[in-house]
């Protein structure tokens, strides 16, 4: 496991709040096992089924922070194209989107969607995650060609401003959930 990701896992595990911007995929904390498996199969070349199983298990283990006694406050903003991008099969997409909608019913999980009709937004440069906890510097994970985790204040601040802007462009929580379920049923339901 790369050092940058180990750093992120520690920050994520200790976080009291997480802000996530994802313009291309359902973020790992909200993925189903089938969705994660389809992603890993698409991303990895020449990897065994056992290795894929281990990656999926690790992804699902990360999600246990949402079930702890004092879970972090999680705010996720998705680009609407995430809802329309086929990962795996149509049934997998349906199930993945219903899962996101159900998780968003938890009081500490907010999922908002930026409609494609909004056009360009402040987050089109790539996905990022910001973890915060009392007594610790905020940690930023930037996802892209060269993934990295950093506590560099200028980068964290820049990402926080971008997050506030994309969140401001997004539909409210309930309207976002309605859109997620509409796409799940209208586009992906078998």
Predicted regions and their residues:
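C-terminal regulatory/effector modules of DNA-binding transcriptional regulators
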Residues: 89-190
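Interdomain hinge/linker segments and adjacent boundary elements that couple functional modules
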Residues: 1-84, 134, 150-190
């Amino acid at each position: 496991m790369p050092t940058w990701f180990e750093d992120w896992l520690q920050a994520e595990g200790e976080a009291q709040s997480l802000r996530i911007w994802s313009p291309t995929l359902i973020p790992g904390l909200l993925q189903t096992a089938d969705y994660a498996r389809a992603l890993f199969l698409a991303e990895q070349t020449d990897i065994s089924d056992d290795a894929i199983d281990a990656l999926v298990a690790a992804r699902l283990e990360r999600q246990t922070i949402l079930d702890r006694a004092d879970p972090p406050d999680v705010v996720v903003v998705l680009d609407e194209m995430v809802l329309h991008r086929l990962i795996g099969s149509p049934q997998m997409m349906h199930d993945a989107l219903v899962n996101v909608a159900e998780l968003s019913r938890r009081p500490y999980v907010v999922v908002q969607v930026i409609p494609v009709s909004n056009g360009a937004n402040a987050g089109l440069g790539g996905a990022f995650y910001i973890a915060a906890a009392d007594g610790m510097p905020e940690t930023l994970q930037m996802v892209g060609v060269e993934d990295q985790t950093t506590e560099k204040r200028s980068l964290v601040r820049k990402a926080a401003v971008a997050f506030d802007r994309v969140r401001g462009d997004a539909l409210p929580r309930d309207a976002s959930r309605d859109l997620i379920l509409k796409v799940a049923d209208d586009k992906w339901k078998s």
